[in-house]
């Protein structure tokens, strides 16, 4: 039994065969999925999808790429609160900082990041954090806003060991994607070895970051098993032991009843 803790099932990539994608995940032993909103409308779609399946949950929030499109932050805050009150919503996000593409100015990204951390704290929900080429600002804001009050996860982790250790010290989980299966991922392998198993999550970030052996094709939740197999190999444990522990981790963070 495995959980894909971060996928984007509402994206147009899945429009033609979404039901089949979900069924393939179930057939592959994926017991639960969390589909992630990237803006207000996508968050609404994520909730609607989750409400149609007992084993799918949703997260709501504003991706740093989309932060630039928000003109009325107070209204957005109220809307996120309302969406987050829905039964199938288990986290806020994804939110955070992306300085690689800089689709939104850094100061706007930071403002929305702080907003969503504080919303998460007020709602008692964990926060799903996106951080790319923004290590120092990400860690600084997480510390200043006391993320440990509500908890959360660094999704699709691409940082270094120092970042991982500081995140762990703030009570965060670290989530690994299909990147861990790539040939050039030795740095990530070393980080996986060093992190306690009870603080690791796995994800696909589908339709992105497809793991080997399907790299280059569209990703989907069924493929999270390849990430799980690689981490089990790195840790020197059975896939069954890994699956049980990581499922327990996800249930604990997202308050899931499994």
Predicted regions and their residues:
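Mid-domain alpha/beta scaffold segments of enzyme catalytic cores
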Residues: 1-258
């Amino acid at each position: 039994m495995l959980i894909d803790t971060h996928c984007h099932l509402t994206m147009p990539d899945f429009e033609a065969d979404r039901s089949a994608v979900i069924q393939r995940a179930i057939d592959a032993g994926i017991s639960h999925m969390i589909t992630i909103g990237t803006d207000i409308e996508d968050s609404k779609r994520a909730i609607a999808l989750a409400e149609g399946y007992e084993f799918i949950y949703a997260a709501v929030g504003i991706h740093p790429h989309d932060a630039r499109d928000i003109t009325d932050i107070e209204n957005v805050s109220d809307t996120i609160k309302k969406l987050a009150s829905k039964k199938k919503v288990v986290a806020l996000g994804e939110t955070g900082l992306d300085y690689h593409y800089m689709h939104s100015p850094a100061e706007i990204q930071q403002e929305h990041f702080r907003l969503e951390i504080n919303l998460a704290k007020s709602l008692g929900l964990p926060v799903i954090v996106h951080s790319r080429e923004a290590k120092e600002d990400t860690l600084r804001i997480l510390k200043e806003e006391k993320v440990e009050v509500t908890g959360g996860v660094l999704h699709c982790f691409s940082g270094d060991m120092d970042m991982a250790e500081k995140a762990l010290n703030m009570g965060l989980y670290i989530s690994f994607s299909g990147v861990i299966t790539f040939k050039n991922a030795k740095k990530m392998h070393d980080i996986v070895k060093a992190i306690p198993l009870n603080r690791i999550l796995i994800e696909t970030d589908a339709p992105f970051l497809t793991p080997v052996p399907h790299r280059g094709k569209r990703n989907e939740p069924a493929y999270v098993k390849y990430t799980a197999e690689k981490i089990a190999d790195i840790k020197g444990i059975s896939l069954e032991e890994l699956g049980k522990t990581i499922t327990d981790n996800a249930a604990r963070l997202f308050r899931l009843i499994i």
